[in-house]
């Protein structure tokens, strides 16, 4: 439930912070929320639960890989893309992440795709294409770049989700989350420095959004996602893709007056329909085993 409700609102918070009037460079905003979030988690791990902070080298290796994919490429990519596209639009593109997970798992496991799987992918990917129809027609270069970054972020998140599920089972979700955000945050800080992002000059609203992202986005929701991946089947965890875009589109329209067009609604419907079809296909295969 935390993943459903909180993550849908983080797209709005990111947009408020990184838009021109917000004052936060996108990579600095993403990096700082990850670093502060990891610090809070490490304090909780040490002071309340009394756990050691050291990890085995193999475990740390997979945390480094997933941290860079999830937080640096995933969260950082969304933050950067939201300087070019609206919060609701970004959430809709990221809502197609379960399609990426399904494609990657089908390739890795060498499964022969069913007719339902193929049709669902075509519908879902068609929805993403329809969402970008106006930008392509109008040759909106900024939005097209934003979409490309979001697709890469989605692919990174999907890849990390699969690695997390297959290589990090049985370990502490809170410890995993802390290290992933620390490593991803450091990666973003290095990238921000290399790209020469300016010193932040955030507005009050941007600071409030940043605080929300640290506490609710990084400490609570991100950690809940890591925990859910260990406790639940992947296709159940990924059902957040049904809810997050709806919440994000509504909040973007309500707070920032982001435009919701017939293209938006039609494309969003196809994406969600495609995701539902993929989940039904995966659920049916699981039940037959």
Which residues make up each language-model segment?
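Hydrophobic/aromatic residues within transmembrane alpha-helices
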Residues: 17, 29, 33, 81, ...
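Helix-helix packing/entry segments at the starts of transmembrane helices
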Residues: 32, 71, 75, 89-96, ...
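Cytoplasmic-side transmembrane-helix entry/capping segments in multi-pass membrane proteins
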Residues: 58-65, 113-124, 171-180
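Glycine-/small-residue-enriched transmembrane alpha-helix faces in small-molecule transporters
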Residues: 1-28, 121, 139-166, 186-190, ...
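Hydrophobic transmembrane alpha-helices of multi-pass small-molecule transport proteins
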Residues: 41, 45, 96, 113-134, ...
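Transmembrane alpha-helices of multi-pass small-molecule transport proteins
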Residues: 20-73, 100, 155-163, 177-196, ...
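Specific transmembrane alpha-helical segments of multi-pass solute transporters/efflux pumps
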Residues: 6, 10-11, 42-94, 130, ...
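Juxtamembrane helix-entry segments on the extracytoplasmic side of multipass membrane proteins
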Residues: 22-27, 31, 55-61, 133-156, ...
């Amino acid at each position: 439930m935390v993943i459903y409700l909180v993550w849908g609102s983080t797209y709005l918070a990111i947009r408020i912070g990184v838009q021109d009037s917000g004052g936060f460079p996108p990579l600095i905003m993403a990096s700082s929320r990850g670093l502060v979030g990891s610090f809070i988690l490490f304090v909780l791990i040490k002071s309340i639960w009394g756990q050691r902070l050291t990890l085995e080298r193999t475990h740390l290796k997979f945390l480094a890989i997933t941290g860079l994919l999830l937080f640096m490429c995933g969260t950082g990519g969304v933050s950067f893309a939201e300087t070019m596209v609206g919060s609701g639009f970004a959430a809709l593109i990221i809502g197609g992440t379960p399609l990426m997970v399904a494609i990657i798992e089908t390739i890795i496991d060498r499964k022969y795709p069913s007719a339902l799987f193929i049709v669902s992918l075509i519908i879902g990917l068609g929805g993403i294409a329809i969402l970008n129809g106006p930008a392509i027609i109008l040759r909106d270069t900024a939005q097209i770049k934003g979409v490309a970054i979001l697709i890469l972020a989605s692919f990174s998140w999907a890849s990390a989700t699969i690695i997390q599920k297959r290589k990090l089972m049985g370990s502490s979700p809170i410890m995993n989350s802390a290290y992933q955000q620390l490593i991803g945050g450091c990666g973003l800080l290095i990238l921000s420095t290399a790209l020469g992002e300016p010193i932040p000059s955030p507005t009050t609203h941007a600071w409030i959004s940043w605080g929300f992202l640290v506490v609710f986005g990084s400490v609570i929701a991100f950690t809940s996602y890591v925990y859910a991946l260990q406790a639940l089947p992947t296709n159940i965890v990924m059902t957040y893709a049904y809810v997050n875009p709806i919440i994000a589109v509504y909040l973007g329209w309500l707070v920032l007056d982001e435009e919701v067009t017939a293209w938006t609604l039609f494309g969003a419907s196809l994406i969600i329909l495609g995701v539902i079809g993929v989940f039904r296909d995966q659920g049916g295969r699981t039940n037959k085993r």
